[in-house]
């Protein structure tokens, strides 16, 4: 059975994809999946369409409908709940490797 999951994804994007020029970053993601591994596989395949690479996922869990995730993520969850094919990407926070 699939549920809506939430994760924090660390992603490598192509040079020039972000205004900062940075190629590493992270974002919150919501999507339907049947397991942690299913989420990882589906998200990797989705990002590959943009030639982006999933580096890691963290804080991955089925959403808790009683928890307030904040305005942006709550909206992402609502949109994901309405569309079982949805993959919602939150704000991308880029960084430079140290």
Model regions: which residues?
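Long, contiguous binding/interaction regions
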Residues: 2-57, 61-98
């Amino acid at each position: 059975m699939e549920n809506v999951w939430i994760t924090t994804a660390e992603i490598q994007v192509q040079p020039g994809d972000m205004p900062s020029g940075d190629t590493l970053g992270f974002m919150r993601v919501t999507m339907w999946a049947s397991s942690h591994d299913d989420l990882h596989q589906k998200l990797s395949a989705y990002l590959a369409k943009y030639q982006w690479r999933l580096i890691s996922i963290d804080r991955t869990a089925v959403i808790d409908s009683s928890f307030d995730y904040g305005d942006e993520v709550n909206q992402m969850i609502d949109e994901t709940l309405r569309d079982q094919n949805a993959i919602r990407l939150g704000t991308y926070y880029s960084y430079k490797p140290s």
